[in-house]
């Protein structure tokens, strides 16, 4: 009888997944105040396109507008509160009010954030600081003017 139980236990063990079969953990991050499913998708796409962490883009969006695409504060526009002149240096060619569109704002502001990410050497706190304060002179000092595109001469894909 013990022999039969041992054989059955070995058979069950052979059928179970071994330690080499890891099941990916699905993390369902709750939405931030004012964030929508569509807005999250746009943020994730802009982060991916510009090779910056989604968490960094989210942090700037929360800091600047709490996920409100129509946010205005003086000369600053939209989700990431970008100046039209800064957006133009990143390839923007529209009217300032066009920056109140979430997709348009993210396209140009995340390009600019990418430069802050490069200047910060992948330090999230420093990237937020450089985004808010401007990083032209730091990019120049580090020899990153061309790579960041902050001089306005870079040809951006549409």
Regions found by a protein language model. Give the residues of each.
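Catalytic and binding regions of secreted/periplasmic enzymes and modules that target cell-wall glycans
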Residues: 110-149
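A short, structured beta-strand-centered segment in the mid-to-C-terminal lobe
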Residues: 95-104
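Export/targeting segments at the very N-terminus of extracytoplasmic proteins
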Residues: 26-62
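Sec-dependent bacterial lipoprotein signal peptides
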Residues: 1-15
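Substrate-binding/active-site groove segments that recognize
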Residues: 75-92
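Short, functionally critical alpha-helical segments immediately adjacent to catalytic or ligand/cofactor-binding
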Residues: 52-67, 109, 128-132
């Amino acid at each position: 009888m013990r022999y039969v139980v041992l054989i059955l236990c070995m058979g069950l063990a052979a059928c179970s997944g071994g330690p080499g079969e890891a099941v990916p953990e699905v993390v369902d991050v709750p939405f931030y105040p004012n964030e929508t499913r569509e807005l999250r998708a746009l943020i994730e796409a802009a982060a991916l396109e510009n090779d910056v962490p989604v968490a960094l883009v989210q942090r700037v969006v929360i800091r600047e507008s709490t996920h409100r695409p129509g946010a205005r504060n003086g000369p600053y526009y939209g989700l990431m509160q970008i100046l039209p002149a800064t957006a133009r240096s990143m390839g923007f060619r529209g009217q300032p009010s066009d920056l109140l569109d979430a997709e348009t704002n993210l396209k140009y502001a995340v390009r600019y954030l990418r430069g802050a990410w490069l200047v910060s050497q992948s330090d999230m706190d420093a990237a937020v600081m450089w985004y808010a304060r401007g990083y032209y002179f730091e990019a120049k000092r580090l020899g990153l003017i061309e790579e960041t595109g902050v001089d306005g001469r870079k040809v951006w894909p549409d």
